[in-house]
Amino acid sequence: MNILITGVAGLLGSRLADWIQKNTKHTVIGIDDMSGGYEENIPKGVKFYEENLSVDNLDSIFEEHKIDIIYHFAAYAAEGLSPFIRKYNYQNNLLASTNLINHAIKHDIQRFVFASSM
């Protein structure tokens, strides 16, 4: 199976990617815009795309890898700053998540797991 993990450079995404690679034969594809993650968190062997989820090039990623499952962990966590950057959070968290969900529907992905500490 091909598993897409958003936020793969963050805590949740990188830990899940590492576990999948160590315990299964599934392929991990990761997306992160690196606004809060760290490159060293991304396990070796992950096909990594440094992208924002609001861009329209998700189609090419979905088509190239024939995604089976999405784990959506990407979000901009701005502890204490959220009231001051509402527009950014709206675009980066809500609209980006909506874009990902729409791509999942378009590409008939049956499993979509969303987790957030926001």
Residue ranges and their predicted role:
Residues 1-118:
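N-terminal Rossmann-like NAD(P)+-binding domain of SDR-like oxidoreductases, especially those catalyzing
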